[in-house]
Structure formats: structure tokens, C-alpha cells
């Protein structure tokens, strides 16, 4: 069995299957009619409203709205069947169902889905054979079409009603046959290349609609699904105030306009007199789906001049449900910060900020504090700074961390390091390690991850550690290469500065290298100062010669700089 996801246009019957339920008493529940208040003074949900317990389920576990059943425990026989309260007709079950149970609003007129108009290519324009601008005018109520009633009276239609009338007159199978005949006879009829391409696009779309058994009427809303209440929460404050999600105000405005149209129809007023209400209902549904169009319009704003957040805005973008909560979910025991150079570190070490380390190793710290019986309450942890530092250092000694630089294109973009606590907010790295990461110190960021299981820790210590990844996998070339800063530093320390300040000064004579280092530390000498150094080459081979004359001792002095001596000493210690 292969699992797959199929995305298709939902039919009105399918929407009713999602939102409507049949009770044991034989009544259908799911239709929303009320929009006055979401919660009453007691904090209970109003019947038929956006948070109705009868439609969406109870707010407390095994407790009904009226209080007839409180913490009711079902028997084994009752668990198989739906249990309803006799008085308030609320299902006695777990409130988790409020996370996924939906309702619906029955719209009095067909409403256009704005997403089908804004998409490119516009499928409504291809099906109806009308221009996009004209369809948008019909959608906004600026244009209209005239039809005749049964009594042969002219009637003006706009918005969803007009497009619904145009779509109802199109026969899918007959139009497909006509289009295929036009393609076969394109030479005789002298069809242009543009028209030929348009006909091909229509045939592709019509074939897809026939294969998937989609009807044109499904492109319009008849039943508007309402999201579960826990997705759009509401909170009662102490000062009789309510904090509500933006979607609740949008749903409430749709119900208000829809109820107004129902009352006007019941009062037998002709349809031409409440066209404005129909256009307003279309705008309200558009705001619910996508509110970007109404940025400058007063309809899309609330009292504090803040734009209401629509469904598409909740889904799309970095802060949307899909990227933030489903795909790009932030992982626990991880962090991110800017990298900074630190040449004093070893190749297998990295500098980790103290604040970040406390947050990353927080559970480990609590575990140690509970073992030592030093703390009882969690909020007092940050006050014990001295003990905290000692515990944190003991934890870090035996715990390697993983550093990742995005984009992770190959294996060497993730390597393990032994952390060392540092002051500041940046991660510190040895410059020789950066070539494997393809990182520079110009604002690059790295992610920190902690391996938790014993297998992950062993893999980090043996395989992922930076010392064991010195060569590239593709050709065996060394990854630990001197970067721009190191090459520039080597050049700067070995260069002879021929400035008059250095040349005209008296060149001092030294017989010992340690004296030169001491003078450099005392800042009596700079890197570019010229000096004479007594050079004793121990590996030089001399021939033995016996002469009668007095023996002459040969002393060699080399003119060099302080920087070259220090550089030579570093290489000698390394080798």
C-alpha cells in the first residue's frame, strides 16, 4: 500500500460530509446561524454560534453545557454509541474533537472563490471564454448580465449569480467535440497560432475536468466551511473583555450579511433592491479567503486600524502554518548565532556563548541540580550563577555539539566540536576549519544542535569530529587550508618594512631569541623592527685543520625582523 495525498476541488456534498452530522435523534447538526456573541457572560458558548458546543463538541471533558452531566464515565456499551445530553443535546465526549470538528454557513447566493480569479492562467476565463477584466468586473458588481425569467421578464445578474448562470449553460462533452473538430480543420478554417494554442489549453482543461468528474458549479461556494474553534480561539478576560482571533470577526460579518439577505427575501422584496447586500457578501467572503486586496479599504480593517488576517495569510509565508509549524518546525535542543574568528582554539574546539549554553543544556542542568538537592523551584535557577557555571562546565566536558552551516550541500557542512564557554553572543571558530564549511567571517550564521542519544554522541565523537574530516571525500584534497586572513597575517609578519623610521634607527644586537620575545611583550620592539641575531647553526659540518697560527672564532650575525623570528618559532613548535 502506497500512501499519497490527492488535492481536488471539493463538491458541496463533500463539504457537507465534513461539516454536517446526524444525531441519534435524527437531526442534522453543523449549520451556523448566530453571530451576536461568541461567549455569554458566564463564559459559555451560545447555541448556533461560532463556538457552539452542540456543533463542535463540549469544552470540558465528559461535561455538557447545562451541567446535567459532570465528569460522566461511559460504560463499555456506551463507548460504542454517541451519548447526548437530554436537555442541551451536547455530545458527552472528549474536548479534543474541537480541534478537528467543523461547521458550515449556508450561503443564500452562489459566491465566487477569489483564488480562481487571481490564479494565472485564470481557469474561469478559459472555461467561460470571457476576458479576465470582465470577470473581475462581474465579481466586484461593476458589470452585469441580463436574463429572462419564466414570465419573460428581464432580470439583471451580477457577481456569483451571473457567473453561475454562464457556467450552467456550458455543456462539457459537446464543447469538447466542437474543439477537437476545430483542431482537425484548422487548415481549412485558417486558425491563427494564438487561437490554436488557446483551443489546446481548453481541451486539456476539459479533459481533466471529465476525468476527475468535476462540475462547473463546484467552482462557486454554496456551503462555506467554518474552521474548528480551537484553530481560531477566544479568551474571556477579567474586565468583561474578550480576545478573539481575526477569523471569528470575519465569519461573524459573513453570517450577519447572509442573515440580512434571508430576511429581505422572506419579505418578498425584488432582488434588484438588495444587490448591494449581495456584493457586500461577496466582499466579506473574499476577505476571509484572501484579505490582501482590501488593504486600503475600510472593510478589511478593524477599530485599531489593523488589517484582519485571512486564511491564506495564516497559511502562506515564513510565519504561516505550513512553513513554521509543519515543514520548518524549529527543533528542540538547537540554536543559531553568528560565527566569529578565534585562532587560540584547537581544531576540535568551538566557543559557545554562555547564555545559549544554559538554554541548550537546560534539562541536563535541572537533572544535576535535583541530584545534588540544591534547588526545588525552577525559576530560581538563574540566581545560582556560581554553581551553575561549575555544573555547566562539567556537563560540556563530555558532551560534543554539532555545528551546521546552511545550505547543507555535503557531509562536511555538519561537524562535531567540543564546546568551550565564552562571553558574548557569537559562536567562535578556528579559521582553518572554515574552508570545509565554505564559511567566511562576514556575518555568516551557524546552527547548533545537541546529540541526545548515546549512539548520536558516539557518532559525533568518532565520525563527525572536525579532526577526522581533514580531507575531502571526492578527491582527497586537504580541507584544512589557510584562508585569506591567515595568508595576509603570515605575509604581514614576514614583510620587511623599508620605512625610514625602521631603517634609520639603530639596529640592536641580540644573542638569544628569548630576550627578543621578552622585549616584544614589553612593547619595546614592534614586528617590523630590524635586529641582528647571533646565528648558531648546530648542523653545520666543519673540516678539521691544524694550523700553527692562533685559532680564529667565526661568529655569524643575521639581519632579520621580530615578526620573522616569531613566525619561525611557531612553525618549529608545530613541527
Curated annotation (Swiss-Prot):
Cofactor(s) demanded: Mg(2+); Zn(2+)
Origin superkingdom: Eukaryota
Bound cofactor: record note: Binds 1 Mg(2+) ion per subunit. Binds 1 Zn(2+) ion per subunit.
Binding positions (Mg(2+)): 440, 442, 444
Keyword list, A-Z: DNA-directed RNA polymerase, Magnesium, Metal-binding, Nucleotidyltransferase, Plastid, Transcription, Transferase, Zinc
Entry-linked InterPro entries: DNA-dir_RpoC_beta_prime, RNA_pol_asu, RNA_pol_N, RNA_pol_Rpb1_1, RNA_pol_Rpb1_3_sf, RNA_pol_Rpb1_clamp_domain
Gene Ontology MF terms in the entry: DNA binding; DNA-directed RNA polymerase activity; metal ion binding
Catalytic activity: RNA(n) + a ribonucleoside 5'-triphosphate = RNA(n+1) + diphosphate
Hydrolase found in the keyword field: no
UniProt-annotated location(s): Plastid
EC number: 2.7.7.6
Membrane-traversing stretches: none
Subunit record text: In plastids the minimal PEP RNA polymerase catalytic core is composed of four subunits: alpha, beta, beta', and beta''. When a (nuclear-encoded) sigma factor is associated with the core the holoenzyme is formed, which can initiate transcription.
Name used for this protein in its record: DNA-directed RNA polymerase subunit beta'
Organism: Euglena longa (Euglenophycean alga)
Amino acid at each position: 500500500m502506497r500512501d499519497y495525498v490527492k488535492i481536488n476541488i471539493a463538491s458541496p456534498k463533500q463539504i457537507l460530509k465534513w461539516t454536517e452530522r446526524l444525531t441519534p435523534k435524527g437531526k442534522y447538526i453543523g449549520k451556523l446561524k448566530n453571530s451576536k456573541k461568541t461567549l455569554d457572560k458566564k463564559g459559555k458558548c451560545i447555541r448556533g454560534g461560532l463556538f457552539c458546543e452542540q456543533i463542535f463538541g463540549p469544552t470540558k471533558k465528559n461535561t455538557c453545557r447545562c451541567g446535567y452531566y459532570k465528569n460522566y464515565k461511559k460504560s463499555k456499551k456506551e463507548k460504542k454509541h454517541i451519548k447526548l445530553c437530554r436537555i442541551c443535546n451536547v455530545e458527552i465526549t472528549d474536548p479534543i474533537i474541537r480541534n478537528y470538528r467543523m461547521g458550515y454557513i449556508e450561503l443564500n447566493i452562489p459566491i465566487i472563490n477569489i483564488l480562481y480569479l487571481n490564479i494565472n492562467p485564470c481557469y474561469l476565463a478559459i472555461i467561460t471564454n470571457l476576458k479576465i477584466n470582465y470577470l473581475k468586473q462581474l465579481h466586484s458588481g461593476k458589470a452585469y448580465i441580463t436574463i429572462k425569467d419564466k414570465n419573460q421578464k428581464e432580470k439583471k445578474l451580477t457577481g456569483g449569480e451571473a457567473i453561475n448562470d454562464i457556467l450552467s449553460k456550458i455543456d462539457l462533452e459537446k464543447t469538447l467535440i466542437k474543439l477537437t473538430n476545430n483542431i482537425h480543420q484548422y487548415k481549412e478554417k485558417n486558425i491563427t497560432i494564438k487561437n490554436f494554442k488557446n483551443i489546446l489549453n481548453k481541451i486539456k482543461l476539459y479533459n481533466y475536468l471529465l476525468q476527475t468528474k468535476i462540475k462547473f458549479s463546484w467552482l462557486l461556494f454554496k456551503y462555506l466551511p467554518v474552521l474548528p474553534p480551537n484553530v481560531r480561539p477566544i479568551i474571556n478576560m477579567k474586565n468583561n473583555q474578550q480576545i478573539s482571533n481575526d477569523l471569528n470577526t470575519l465569519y461573524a460579518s459573513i453570517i450577519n450579511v447572509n442573515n440580512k439577505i434571508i430576511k429581505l427575501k422572506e419579505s418578498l422584496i425584488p432582488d434588484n433592491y438588495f444587490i448591494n447586500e449581495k456584493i457586500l457578501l461577496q466582499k466579506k467572503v473574499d476577505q476571509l479567503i484572501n484579505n490582501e486586496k482590501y488593504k486600503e479599504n475600510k472593510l478589511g480593517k478593524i477599530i485599531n486600524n489593523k488589517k484582519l488576517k485571512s486564511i491564506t495569510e495564516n497559511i502562506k509565508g515564513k510565519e504561516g502554518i505550513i512553513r513554521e509549524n509543519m515543514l520548518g518546525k524549529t527543533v528542540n535542543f538547537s540554536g543559531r548565532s553568528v560565527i566569529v574568528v578565534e585562532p587560540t582554539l584547537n581544531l576540535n574546539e568551538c566557543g559557545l556563548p554562555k547564555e545559549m549554553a544554559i538554554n541548550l543544556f537546560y534539562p541536563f542542568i535541572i537533572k544535576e541540580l535535583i541530584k545534588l538537592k540544591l534547588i526545588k523551584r525552577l525559576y530560581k535557577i538563574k540566581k545560582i550563577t556560581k554553581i551553575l557555571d561549575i555544573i555547566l562546565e562539567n556537563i560540556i566536558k563530555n558532551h560534543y555539539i554539532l555545528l551546521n552551516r546552511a545550505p547543507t550541500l555535503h557531509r562536511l557542512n555538519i561537524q562535531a566540536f567540543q564546546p568551550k564557554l565564552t562571553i558574548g553572543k557569537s559562536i567562535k571558530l578556528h579559521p582553518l576549519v572554515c574552508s570545509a564549511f565554505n564559511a567566511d567571517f562576514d556575518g555568516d550564521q551557524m546552527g547548533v544542535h545537541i546529540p541526545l542519544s548515546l549512539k548520536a554522541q558516539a557518532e559525533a565523537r568518532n565520525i563527525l569530529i572536525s579532526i577526522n574530516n581533514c580531507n575531502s571525500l571526492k578527491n582527497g584534497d586537504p580541507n584544512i587550508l589557510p584562508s585569506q586572513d591567515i595568508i595576509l597575517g603570515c605575509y604581514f609578519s614576514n614583510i620587511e618594512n623599508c620605512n625610514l623610521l625602521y631603517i634609520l634607527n639603530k639596529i640592536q644586537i641580540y644573542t638569544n631569541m628569548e630576550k627578543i620575545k621578552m622585549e616584544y611583550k614589553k612593547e619595546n620592539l614592534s614586528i617590523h623592527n630590524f635586529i641582528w641575531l647571533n646565528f648558531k647553526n648546530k648542523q653545520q659540518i666543519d673540516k678539521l685543520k691544524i694550523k700553527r697560527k692562533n685559532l680564529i672564532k667565526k661568529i655569524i650575525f643575521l639581519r632579520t625582523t621580530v615578526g620573522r623570528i616569531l613566525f619561525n618559532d611557531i612553525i618549529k613548535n608545530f613541527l
